[in-house]
Amino acid sequence: MATLTNVNDKIIAQRALEGFTEYLHPMNLFSTSYSDETKNKGDTIIVPLVGTLTATTFNQDYQVGGGTLTAVTINLNVHKIVPLSLTDVQFANSSVAQLEKWGFQAGQALATAITQHVFSYVTSGSPSFFNTAYTYPVASWNVSRIATIRQAMTVAKVPMDNRSLFLDPTAYSQTLSDTNISYAMYAGTNDALREGRVPRVYGFDIRESNLIPTTDTMYGFACHPSALALAIRALAPQAPSAYEAAGVVTNAETGAALGMRRHYQPSNGTHYLNFEAIFGATYGITAGLSRIAFR
């Protein structure tokens, strides 16, 4: 089986993994299953939902059925690739910096495609699983709205840890410029001013995203990891020996992995590189996510 033994292959694959991991990071706020094991399209993965265990009274027996972990089954039914072609001269003479740039962009593009797929489950155009619970005009969005959302989620018994709030650039900018955030900055953190980054607010990790679907004028959503589940695997090549290089690179910390394969076409002197993953997503617990829109 061909592997990633060529120095250039290793460089570009490693940078692709770094771009993939960095841009996939927001997906860690959902229930996920990542692994370096290869799978085929159509295979299924069982993913436990975060925060669904419950306690039961001990009755002199540890073999009890209570406390069963809720899980969902995900079909790996989506296959995305990021293609890159280089002539043999380009490939041989590419600088390390160029290879790193191409690799990072390829990983970023693959992670973006996965994020867009997961976010499509939040729209009302998909099965009516989540409610549009909050209908604030975008112009009126501020930190006090987050406090209202927090209270409603707590009353609905959504776990109080691991909550996150995704906002489009407009709503995020208004959060960033809110005077309460400014006061917090003066109290000790200058992330808002220096990095343009909103810190945690009222128990929520605040995330800016320009990938939030605008269906029904949605501009954000509040969620718990139990709301959505995602599984990602590398695709197993059908004929590994047919490639100049083929392999899987894995992030040791998160387990996120992507596949890379390269083949050469002598007729036009071109190397074809493809970075890929197969994945799937599904709904978890209804109360775990609420859309925010202006109507």
Give the predicted meaning of each segment:
Residues 1-76, 293:
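N-terminal "assembly arms/tails" that initiate or stabilize quaternary assembly
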Residues 2-7, 57, 91, 105-136, ...:
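Signature of extracytoplasmic/envelope-associated structural regions
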Residues 4-17, 21, 236-239, 247, ...:
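Surface-exposed molecular-recognition determinants
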Residues 47, 72-131, 156-169, 206, ...:
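Long, contiguous amphipathic alpha-helices that act as assembly "spine/axial" helices in icosahedral shell
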Residues 55-58, 94, 174-177, 184, ...:
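Short helix/loop capping segments that flank catalytic or ligand/cofactor-binding pockets
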Residues 186-237, 262, 267, 274-277:
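A structural signal for small-residue-enriched, beta-sheet-centric alpha/beta enzyme cores
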Residues 252-295:
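Extended, compositionally biased alpha-helical segments that mediate assembly or anchoring
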